[in-house]
Amino acid sequence: MRVAVSGFKGRMGHEVVKTVLREADLELVAVLDHEPKEKNINEIVEFSSLDVPVFGNLSEMLEEIKPDCVVDFTTPKVGYSNTKTILEHGVRAVVGTTGFTPEQISELRSIAESKKIGALIAPNFAVGAVLMMQFAQKAAKYFPNVEIIELHHDNKLDAPSGTAVKTAEMMAETREFVKQGAADEVELIEGARGAEYEGMRIHSVRLPGLVAHQEVIFGAEGQGLTIRHDSYDRISFMSGVALSVRKTKELETLIYGLENILD
C-alpha cells in the first residue's frame, strides 16, 4: 500500500514514518507538515537515503500523489478538517489525532460510506491499552464505583485523553449509574475532583518524562481493583497503526476504536 504520513515531524508521526519504512508491504510515498522547510525528506539527516516529497498542503498532496492511505497524527485543532479532506478525496485514513466529537465522527463515517472507503480513528493504537479498556468495561458491571487517572507527557494538548474518554464511554455501557463521591462533597479548589462523565471522575496528569499511561481504579466494600496500562515508548502504538492501515482495504466505512478490528 502507498502510504502518506500527515504530521511526520511530530513524535508519533516520526515513529509512523519509521514503521512504514520497516514494513515490506507498505511504501512511504509522501509526508506532510505545517509550513515545512524541506521539499524532500532526504534533507533530514536521518532519512538522507530516501526520496520522498514533503508537502505543506494536504489537498495538493492528495491530488498529486494519490496515496492509498493517509496516516494522520497532527493536533486536535486540525484533525477533523484533515480527516474530512482525506475522505472527500476518496483516500483511506488512519487517524490517531484525538479530540473528535461524536457528531464529527458520525459525519466522517457518512463521508467514508458515501465514498465506499475504509477509515479508522483510534484514541489509542496500543493493543495493551485496548485490552485495558475491555477489561475495565467488564469490571464496571460489578464495580460501578470507579475513577480514571490518565497520565501523559506535558506536550499533549487535549485533556482528558481520548483513551480516558473512550474508556469511560465503554464502561458506561455496562455500568449502573453512580455519581462518584459524597452527595454533598465540596471542592475547596475548583476542579479538584476532576472531570465528570456519566458520574465517573476522570483526572489528567501532564508531566515531562511520561509517554502514555492510564489507571482505572475500582472500589467496593472491603476490596479494590486497579487496571493499569503503560506505554513507555511510542513503538508500542506502531503494530496497531500498521494493522489499521492494512485493515482499511477491507472496509467501506469508518471504524472508531482499535478494539473493533481486533480478532
Swiss-Prot record:
Lineage: Bacteria, Bacillati, Bacillota, Bacilli, Bacillales
MF term (GO), any: NADP binding
Stored Pfam families: DapB_C, DapB_N
Superkingdom of origin: Bacteria
GO cellular component: cytosol
UniProt KW Cytoplasm keyword: yes
Protein's cellular compartments: Cytoplasm
Stated name of the protein: 4-hydroxy-tetrahydrodipicolinate reductase
Positions with a binding annotation for NAD(+): 7-12, 96-98, 122-125
Organism: Listeria monocytogenes serotype 4b (strain F2365)
Function: Catalyzes the conversion of 4-hydroxy-tetrahydrodipicolinate (HTPA) to tetrahydrodipicolinate.
SUPFAM superfamilies, sorted: Glyceraldehyde-3-phosphate dehydrogenase-like, C-terminal domain (SSF55347), NAD(P)-binding Rossmann-fold domains (SSF51735)
InterPro entries documented for this protein: DapB_C, DapB_N, DapB_N_CS, DHDPR_bac, NAD(P)-bd_dom_sf
First-level EC class: oxidoreductase
UniProt keyword list: Amino-acid biosynthesis, Cytoplasm, Diaminopimelate biosynthesis, Lysine biosynthesis, NAD, NADP, Oxidoreductase
E.C. numbers: 1.17.1.8
UniProt catalytic activity: (S)-2,3,4,5-tetrahydrodipicolinate + NAD(+) + H2O = (2S,4S)-4-hydroxy-2,3,4,5-tetrahydrodipicolinate + NADH + H(+); (S)-2,3,4,5-tetrahydrodipicolinate + NADP(+) + H2O = (2S,4S)-4-hydroxy-2,3,4,5-tetrahydrodipicolinate + NADPH + H(+)
Family that this chain belongs to: Belongs to the DapB family.
Residue stretches spanning the membrane: none
